[in-house]
Amino acid sequence: MNIILMGLPGAGKGTQAERIVKEFDIPHISTGDMFRAAVKNETPLGLEAKSYMDKGHLVPDEVVIGIVRERLSMDDCAKGFLLDGFPRTVPQAEALTATVKELGREIDHVININVQREQLIERLTGRWICPVCGASYHTMFNPPKEAGVCDKDGGKLYQREDDKIEVVTQRLDVNIAQTQPLIDYYSAQELLRDIDGEQDIQVVFAEIKSLLRG
């Protein structure tokens, strides 16, 4: 079972990825992990990727695809895989389709965990941290007893720069613009399945499981 998992920041993709790979006994393959492993193992493609990254340049698609191909060729992918964070563009998606085909396989499912923009903003801007003890709170999921104050030591909670609404909104809008062409691409291939990510975590996973077993 070969799966691509899509979802914007805050959609709960990481949580569902963990559950899927455990349920179906397939490896969770993220681009970050792939790159780190290739660089650490000093594979020719890993070293080539590192030379671009060291200069602050984007790694060319052909190198990225080469690293993906190496990873998908490993023994632990024999029963399938879950790809997370790749592809990011339509050319990468086309190259991935060709690569998987060359390996005698195909992409079976593309799952998009769908959450409305306003809900994502609320999720992503809800984290507040205590400067004294480092405790983390969330206004939606784990609020302090008194707003803005740490339960443990009374420290005044603060918000990281990355969690502020201006930064979150900009990051989300960039992601939405990048993701839409991929959604269109996989929709046209009749591979894409939208899952409502605004439901309870257990319900989201139950729907994904039902889809994959169907």
Curated annotation (Swiss-Prot):
Stretches the record annotates as LID: 126-163
Instruction: Spell out the coiled coil positions from the record.
Output: none
Binding-site positions, Zn(2+): C130, C133, C150, D153
PROSITE patterns in the record, alphabetically? ADENYLATE_KINASE (PS00113)
**Which positions bind AMP?**
T31, R36, H57, L58, V59, G85, F86, P87, R88, Q92, R160, R171
Q: Region labeled NMP — which residues? A: 30-59
Q: What EC number(s) does this enzyme carry?
A: 2.7.4.3
Primary role: Catalyzes the reversible transfer of the terminal phosphate group between ATP and AMP. Plays an important role in cellular energy homeostasis and in adenine nucleotide metabolism.
This chain belongs to the protein called Adenylate kinase
